[in-house]
Amino acid sequence: MMKFNVGDFMAELNKQLLATTSGKACEDNIVLSSNVRVTVLTDKMLRVEYNPDGVFTDLPSQTVWYRDFGKVEFSTKTDNDILVVETKSVIFNINNHTGSFKSAVIDGEEKTYNSSHNLKGTTRTLDGTYGPKELDEGIVSTDGVSVYDDSKTLLLNDDGTLSLREKGTKDIYVFAYGNDYINWIKDFYKITGKPPLVPRYVLGNWWSRYRAYTQKEYEDLMSEFFRRDIPLTIATVDMDWHWVDIKSKFGKQTKKEQHWNSGWTGYSWNTELFPDYKGFLTKLHDMGLKVTLNLHPADGVRSFENMYPQMAEALGIDKETEKAVEFDLTNNKYINAYFDILHHPYENEGVDFWWIDWQQGTKSKKAGLDPLWLLNHYHYLDTDREERRPLILSRYAGIGSHRYPLGFSGDTAINWSVLDFQPYFTANAANCGYTWWSHDIGGHMMGEHDDELYIRWLQMAVFLPILRLHSTSMDFLGKEPWNFSWEAEVLGTEFMRLRHKLIPYIYSMNYRTYNDGRALCEPMYYNYPEKEVAFEYKNEYMFGSELLVCPVTTKLDAKTKTAATKVWLPEGRWTNIFDGKIYKGNQEAFINSPINTIPVLAKEGAIIPMSADSGNTWECPEHLSINVYRGNNTIDFYEDDGETGKYKNGEFSISKMSVCEEGDTIKFTISGGKQLKCIPQKRIYTLEFKDVEEFDEVSVSINGIETPASYGKSFVNIEDVSVEDEITVTLTGAVAKANKPVEERVLDCLTHLNGSNMKKAFTNSRLKNCKTENDYKALVRRVKAKSFRMCLDEAIFALK
């Protein structure tokens, strides 16, 4: 094993790799009692430390970076072995000698924590899974209280390095929020740091595939996507961008290497596949694509690499010995050289961010230090520059990993069970603050070719944080829509276009995550914690503030040609964005989806800003199409340049979009935003009132001045408008869209049903004789085919 001088480890880290933290708490909030120190962080959250020597630390940890949020009013008393800490909201009971949490009293009710009631969080990876996987604990619990044990994490020193804790110590965080899960996670973000604002371009469609493309093949493939008008924003090149067949290519040169047969690690472009890699990166950028490359850094830097001489010199190795530069994230000299020599030059040439594909376990030279965590930490900090918003793609490395988006969930099987697990898996990660999972859409490996599965996976992905197509290297496993049936190609193309159009909405929700601590995909019980039923529908979630999503994860029924998905609809009116069906709230119901739709329901008053620009541009659109649903609601429409850190200095625009319904009058307003270089000087707005049949009159005013506009039965088009302008559109005599009469809905079910026409005729005659709801219920109960029964149930009872 290669040895380094002590000076290697004592070298200072690049300043870019030093996190900004504030671990010392407000002195007024600290209580010392024997070998226990309690810090009142908020009126609902404590830090409790135990040290047999009575020595405590203010250093931040790998997870917790901040502890000073101002003075909190509280009182303390000792009751036998219990230290009682009382704030305005909670009475905490802590063991005075061990620091163990005993209970908390919230609104007069004593609550204890049972880890089996934890709502779970997420897990490191789904690699190799064929279906569900056990999840790690999250931060929130149905007990109303929870304990996060930070004792096993390392401490983060001022110089950016990590140190071990003293043995026998305890460091826990106690949360007591009842069923207020939203503020539970918000306050968790106070101590860990909030989720960053991810770049705008990550919200479009990604192309990725594990395949040894040539430069021309990859360029031609991107051109083919655009020829077919399928927008992409990110081009991923898996590990074959560098030399992989090391033995045959460098056998003689690497004969002294211990790892000569491993091609996963590499930093030198494969010039046989990419003869002009700089031109390749430039061409992808010219196509409007951002580029990410795959990394497997575990084998360090070996003698065949182009950068080996520089790395060897930086680490004090005689290059003539051809000794590998060992991968070692406990060595500051290595860390600095790793970024300065291996990565920064490629970034300057056009690599926009890195996909860190670490799969080599959790051990390193420092006890308790997971290399994945440190790779995520340093890589993310290294890319945080004013002109370049930080970004990585990597696996989850434990609580606090939300600071380092995006998450890569790993290589799963191609099957329905994996698909069925992913909606729950994605939304449930909100319980540990992890908001940006990215999956291999369509599955990665194994399984079988299934057009229907591909369609359903892609449909779900439109309403996930990231849509990244990916697959393994088999020649026939490409996820291009045209590799599937005609129906799958048409629908896959249509849904990828929809995802691209949704970037303005998703980006505004990205800001909501950053500013308000609300996950893009959020379990239903966050908004409805008092409803027990909200906990039962694990595959159902809110996609931003406006849309309820429950993906289809089962096959079509042969008779009905639909897939039945059971959903829970909260109070209010819910409208399917695909077919316009309107559902009653406060019910559990089956939604029967043909192959071209899934249950995505707009809430009452929903506002969905979308891009109507052509092509694959991801920037702020010139033509903004806004889908509006009747009701009363306001959203913040957020815009900035999408890729730099200038928003931190105020270079962003927020426009309030509001809808107000009063009788047959609907008023929609857009407050003036801020004009920025990244926003078109003049913009076209198309307002589509999705659940309005028609209206008598429309008036449009800009900055209070009546303005002419074009319009149709349910849309209004306004041109030549500045982002700073205040817009008011008023519809009078608006007629609300309604579902078809129940008789027509029932006939639709029969018309599309595969089966005996004589049996259908018999059923139809009986349905025609139904006069009351009870008549329908009695008849539906007698229908033998479950799938048809569910279709009738939706048509008769679920719709308004």
Language-model segments: residues:
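Short, well-ordered beta-strand segments enriched in hydrophobic/aromatic residues
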Residues: 38, 46-48, 85-92, 548-551, ...
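Surface-exposed beta-strand/loop patches in extracellular or lumenal glycoproteins
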Residues: 47-49, 53, 557-570, 675-694
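Accessory, solvent-exposed terminal regions and/or long lumenal/extracellular loops of proteins
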Residues: 605-705, 723, 731-800
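A low-complexity, Ser/Thr/Gly/Pro-enriched, surface-exposed linker/loop concept
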Residues: 9-12, 16, 41-80
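N-terminal-proximal low-complexity accessory segments that begin disordered
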Residues: 17-18, 22-47
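Solvent-exposed beta-strand/loop surfaces of large extracellular or lumenal domains
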Residues: 59-73, 260, 317, 575-595, ...
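Catalytic-domain carbohydrate-binding cleft regions of carbohydrate-active enzymes
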Residues: 4-15, 22, 92, 103-596, ...
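A surface-exposed beta-strand-loop module
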Residues: 81, 91, 708-728
